[in-house]
Amino acid sequence: MERVMEDIKPAYKELHAFIRKELHEKYGGSVVNPRGPIPDHLFQQVREQAWQANSVIEPYFPKANLPPYDSFVAHYDAKDMINAAENFYQSLGFDGLDKEFYEKQLKEQDQSAENGDCRADIFDLTPHVYMKYCKKVEFRKFLQVHGYLGRLHYAKEKQNLPSYFFNSYDLEYPVGEAIILSASTPKHLQAIGLSKNFEFSDQILMNRLFRMGIHTMLNIPLYFVHTKVMTDLLNGTVEIERINKHYWELMVKYAGVEPPSDRPESAIDFPYNFYLDMEENHQTKKFVSEVLGYHFYRSFCEETHHKGYLHNCDFYGNMEIGNSLKSMMSLGSSKPWNETLVRVLGTNPSLSGDALLAYYTPMLDWLKAKNRESKVKIGWNSSQKKIL
């Protein structure tokens, strides 16, 4: 994980510098130091608004110019979205989900039980997997379903193993991420007829890529910091009395983010998602899945001999990729992690940031040119906030 953070550091600093400049122009020097870390509440605002009309990139890439994504799937219902996602996996050579699954293992969420984001629930009891799906129809849910079905197919492929090999190193999550990256491309949406009447210009492609990049590259340092705080606490590197101070030291070091105000000794500032890590290593899974998903995606695109920028590569219909995936999935945890990844990534697989950087190359080139033009500082000074 440290290697990934080191790999993406130069690119992250460019994005950080651009965001800080935009925030400084909007809120002034009394709120945002043009050479310092970004206040946490504004950093979180930028992250949450990545796909909104008030994003920091709005002056350059207006939300109004994005494709009408939700209208692409407006004629679907929830089961149509599941069938469309299932079609993607079948195009790779996976067996279809059987009648028993649709009749006994696929259930609609109770309306009273639906959470605000309305995410599906997956219960992996290999060889049986159960799914409670959300009835909400929007493009984001359409993509999420593609990821969820990766978990279902992973369970099916490893079901013949002894039960003590059912653990899959959580690789079903990056598989889902890679499928989502392909299913969301303009190339794929046009191929399956969802966007046949919409023309994707280079400007629109950059608009989409930039918003994806903000969401991805601002989340990765947070996943890392949350994981490191927990690790440092458990291995005795930091004492519990210093945990909040340690948290902010890591946020400044890795994310260039500081608290919005001085913090008293009694403060505990971890966000809610930090606590998700306590039982299931949630933030660690998110970090590895995000980064490894781009590795899988790039590997699949290389297998298709894709030409041009990586962010519009669609591997739908490629049986060889499906065979590679099934070969990896069928191993469960019967082989070590590295040997399992070899089935998809080839020799000597390792976790690094290079695939992610390759995906966002056009955005990063734009950022570097814009930052040179604006003559902004790249990187950040230490925080002046007092943290006791």
Residue ranges, per PLM feature:
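Acidic/polar loop patches that form or flank catalytic/metal-binding clefts of enzymes
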Residues: 90-101, 160-165, 185-195, 240-244, ...
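Acidic/His metal-coordination segments adjacent to aromatic residues that form catalytic metal sites
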Residues: 128-136, 159-167, 205-210, 268-277
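Active-site-proximal, well-structured secondary-structure segments within enzyme catalytic domains
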Residues: 1-132, 198-218, 317, 336, ...
